[in-house]
């Protein structure tokens, strides 16, 4: 999960005050796949006092729906047309019997925050209006500044905000590693492949994307009857999530770009990354094969990078050895791309 810092802030902002009888309100926000939901489910499972109750509100438009769902988790069934007064009366009795305070987590809360101003007012003023001491944590993707204007903020009162930043490559690697240990046999993957999944997923900053690529790559390897996930399985999985290199994009490329791209593919046939030396060697062979010489390799590589076809990074070569540029393709299996390029060059 890699969210220890965020959990500590939630503990200090909401959980500890609520345990001491102080009502607080918090909004968690951040991009999809940044661990908001899994963090709140973890806290709902692990924290006993105060009690943390999780409700997914993606299908709800009103706070009233959330409160009815909340009560149902304790076996209390109420009519959908219940008034706020009757709902909070039932909640007040529940909390009295429980003998501890409650934090209500409302996930996928954007629709409610954008539209149910009356319901939110009742929820935020529940202590004053109904003597119900209930703290709330809203989970959304949008920045609260987009959801609330100054007038609405003043009406609702003070609440805190915590942004869940995007995961780093290292954090995604740890999450993917944990999932691989849980879900796959030890012979089904190696650390280089998991690191490559983290590399491919890092542009999204999303653990969800990394886990999805791992699952799809494992299925692809199984379909090939391979005992181990390959780099090309990862590329195939990535292309299933968000295809970028399409046939129309390839068809629009000029002859020399295709030749350089084919050289890169041949270097990557069994590798995660390649370098300019390997590409240059392969380009010499391909140039001879297709009768095209004097290609400016560096300009062509730069064009492919600018068009998003290839990705590159700078890697150190060890103490005193300097650095070099390494190149990879994330968005399509190089075996498939090789075949498509060869067909275009031969047409």
Curated annotation (Swiss-Prot):
InterPro entries: AAA+_ATPase (IPR003593), AAA_22 (IPR049945), Cdc6_lid (IPR055237), ORC1/CDC6 (IPR050311), P-loop_NTPase (IPR027417), WH-like_DNA-bd_sf (IPR036388)
Transmembrane segments annotated in the record for this chain: none
Binding of ATP, residues: 34-38, 167, 179
GO molecular function: ATP binding; ATP hydrolysis activity
Signal peptide start and end residues: none
Keyword terms of this UniProt record: ATP-binding, DNA replication, Nucleotide-binding
Function: Involved in regulation of DNA replication. Has no effect on MCM helicase activity, either stimulatory or inhibitory. Does not bind DNA.
Protein name in the entry: Putative ORC1-type DNA replication protein 1
Naturally occurring in which organism (per UniProt): Thermoplasma acidophilum (strain ATCC 25905 / DSM 1728 / JCM 9062 / NBRC 15155 / AMRC-C165)
């Amino acid at each position: 999960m890699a969210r220890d810092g965020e959990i500590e802030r939630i503990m200090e902002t909401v959980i500890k005050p609520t345990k001491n009888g102080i009502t607080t309100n918090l909004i968690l926000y951040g991009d999809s796949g940044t661990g908001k939901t899994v963090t709140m489910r973890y806290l709902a499972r692990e924290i006993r006092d105060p009690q943390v109750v999780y409700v997914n509100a993606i299908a709800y438009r009103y706070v009233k729906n959330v409160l009815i769902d909340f009560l149902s988790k304790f076996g209390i069934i109420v009519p959908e047309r219940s008034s706020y007064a009757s709902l909070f009366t039932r909640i007040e009795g529940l909390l009295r019997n429980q003998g501890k305070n409650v934090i209500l987590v409302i996930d996928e809360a954007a629709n409610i925050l954008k539209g149910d101003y009356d319901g939110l007012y009742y929820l935020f003023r529940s202590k004053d209006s109904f003597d119900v001491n209930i703290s709330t944590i809203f989970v959304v993707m949008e920045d609260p500044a987009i959801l609330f204007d100054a007038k609405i903020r003043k009406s609702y009162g003070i609440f805190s905000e915590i942004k869940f930043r995007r995961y780093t490559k290292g954090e995604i690697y740890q999450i993917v590693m944990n999932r691989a240990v849980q879900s796959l046999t030890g012979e089904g993957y190696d650390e280089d492949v998991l690191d490559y999944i983290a590399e491919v997923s890092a542009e999204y900053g999303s653990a969800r994307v990394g886990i999805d690529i791992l699952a799809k790559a494992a299925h692809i390897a199984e379909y090939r009857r391979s005992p181990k996930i390959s780099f090309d399985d990862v590329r195939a999985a990535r292309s299933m999530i968000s295809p970028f290199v399409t046939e129309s994009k390839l068809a629009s490329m000029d002859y020399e770009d295709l030749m350089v791209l084919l050289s890169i593919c041949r270097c990557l046939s069994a590798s995660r990354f390649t370098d300019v030396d390997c590409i240059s060697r392969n380009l010499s062979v391909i140039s001879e094969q297709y009768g095209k010489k004097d290609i400016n390799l560096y300009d062509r590589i730069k064009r492919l990078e600018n068009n998003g076809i290839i990705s590159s990074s700078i890697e150190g070569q060890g103490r005193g050895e300097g650095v070099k540029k390494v190149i990879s393709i994330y968005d399509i299996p190089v075996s498939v791309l090789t075949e498509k390029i060869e067909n275009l060059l031969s047409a």
